[in-house]
């Protein structure tokens, strides 16, 4: 099914309001497995709207008109649609009663003939009741094309769509199901390159890659009549993706850290810490508490996070974490030594199961001979301490700091998963 959205209102064309309805409707229709092919905006002009309707009727199976259902002279959507279809406007009984009730309880409001328009629908249409306003919507199919009229205000349109329109549309259509895979440790360009054959040959399910700061997302989507059917199809595609190797021989399966739109590396670590009954602390230099703040974002953080340290200067690193100042001066703050000593010191002082440390060069200037984006991340548990070096090049200062925390969370995640495998 090809769908088209028509926003009616001169105020949209002049930029006075933003057409947020288009985004909302497109998302809702996609969830139903209905493909939106066109977004159109037209002013409050009958001739131009008739022209748009003529074009839409020839290229779309579902035409949804938003706006122009109110009581003013320029609210002409229903009148124009009726004229286009060669039908009359009739009164909907329930909408008329709602109009009567509205004015009966507001004696100071003047009821003009224009107000009656809000209770009218196109002859033969099924009314879509307005749960938060007065203007009734409607849905009608003529010569194989389904036309829908909806109010313009989002506060009226959204409830009408969710509670009136969607049930009317879902009777005969499959639903779009999606699964979101989240990757860390592979860039979008490489990921797209190594699964190019899957993307090029996709029909159903489909693959859509998205890049976020420091990570990549793949949305797998399929049309199905049930969740079970969708899962079977998506499982096959996911396994094909997981079995693919990166350019340096890593398995993509090892780079998938989780699922879902709102998931994050921070949450995965928080979840695993709670699952295994472990605690964590952190000592942060260049990230200045970002790692700890991310952990504390989740309700119940006190179960896994006792407290931590922000040690920006060399002197504070020495004083707060019991690291000999002479050793810090010898190795420099941007080093494996400092990252490991910070992680160990924080872990011991808080008696936590894991200590994480971040030290490096946020930029834009170099430090101790290290270019901007050079970061050392230390991790200590009750048995050992180690560190990694990453170079986050070509990024802003804020991006370097944020991506550094992602590397730190991934390091903890891997350690927790290894502990799980050893149980």
Curated annotation (Swiss-Prot):
Q: InterPro entries of this UniProt entry? A: CinA (IPR050101), CinA-like_C (IPR036653), CinA_C (IPR008136), CinA_KH (IPR041424), Competence-induced_CinA (IPR008135), MoaB/Mog-like_dom_sf (IPR036425), MoaB/Mog_dom (IPR001453)
Give the Gene3D superfamilies listed for this entry: 3.30.70.2860, CinA-like, MoaB/Mog-like domain
CDD domains for the chain: cinA
User: Organism's domain of life?
Assistant: Bacteria
The membrane-spanning stretches of this chain are none
State the SMART domains in the record.
MoCF_biosynth
Q: By its UniProt entry, which PANTHER family does this protein fall under?
A: NICOTINAMIDE-NUCLEOTIDE AMIDOHYDROLASE PNCC, NMN AMIDOHYDROLASE-LIKE PROTEIN YFAY
Q: Which HAMAP family does this UniProt record tie to the protein?
A: CinA_B
So what family is this one in? Belongs to the CinA family.
Q: This chain belongs to which protein, by name?
A: Putative competence-damage inducible protein
């Amino acid at each position: 099914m090809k769908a088209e959205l028509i926003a009616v209102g001169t105020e949209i064309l002049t930029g006075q309001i933003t057409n947020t309805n288009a985004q909302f409707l497109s998302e809702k229709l996609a969830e139903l497995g209905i493909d939106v092919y066109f977004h159109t905006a037209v002013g409050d002009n009958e001739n131009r709207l008739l022209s748009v309707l003529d074009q839409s009727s020839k290229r779309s199976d579902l035409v949804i008109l938003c706006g122009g259902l109110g009581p003013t002279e320029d609210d002409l959507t229903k009148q124009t649609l009726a004229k286009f279809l060669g039908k009359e406007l009739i009164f909907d009984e329930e909408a008329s009663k709602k109009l009567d009730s509205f004015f009966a309880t507001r004696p100071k409001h003047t009821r003009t003939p224009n107000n009656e328009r809000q209770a009218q629908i196109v002859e033969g249409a099924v009314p879509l009741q307005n749960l938060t306003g007065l203007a009734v919507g409607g849905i009608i199919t003529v010569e194989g094309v389904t036309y829908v009229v909806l109010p313009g205000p989002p506060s009226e349109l959204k409830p009408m769509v969710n509670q009136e329109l969607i049930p009317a549309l879902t009777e005969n259509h499959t639903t779009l199901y999606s699964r979101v895979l989240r990757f860390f440790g592979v860039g979008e360009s490489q990921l797209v390159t190594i699964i190019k054959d899957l993307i090029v040959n996709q029909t159903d399910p489909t693959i859509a890659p998205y890049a976020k700061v420091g990570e990549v997302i793949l949305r797998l989507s399929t049309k199905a009549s049930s969740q079970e059917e969708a899962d079977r199809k998506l499982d096959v595609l996911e396994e094909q993706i997981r079995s693919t190797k990166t350019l340096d021989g890593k398995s993509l399966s090892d780079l998938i850290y989780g699922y879902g739109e709102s998931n994050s590396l921070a949450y995965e670590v928080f979840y695993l810490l709670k699952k295994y009954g472990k605690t964590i602390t952190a000592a942060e230099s260049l990230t200045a508490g970002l790692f700890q703040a991310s952990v504390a974002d989740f309700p119940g953080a006190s179960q896994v996070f006792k407290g931590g340290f922000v040690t920006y200067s060399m002197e504070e690193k020495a004083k707060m974490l019991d690291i000999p100042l002479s050793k810090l001066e010898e190795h420099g703050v941007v080093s494996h030594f400092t990252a490991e000593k910070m992680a160990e010191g924080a872990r011991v002082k808080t008696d936590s199961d894991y200590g994480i440390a971040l030290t490096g060069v946020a930029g834009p200037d170099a430090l101790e001979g290290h270019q901007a984006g050079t970061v050392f991340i230390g991790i200590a548990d009750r048995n050992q301490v180690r560190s990694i070096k990453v170079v986050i090049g070509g990024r802003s200062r804020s991006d370097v700091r944020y991506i550094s925390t992602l590397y730190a969370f991934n390091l903890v995640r891997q350690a927790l998963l290894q502990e799980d495998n050893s149980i």
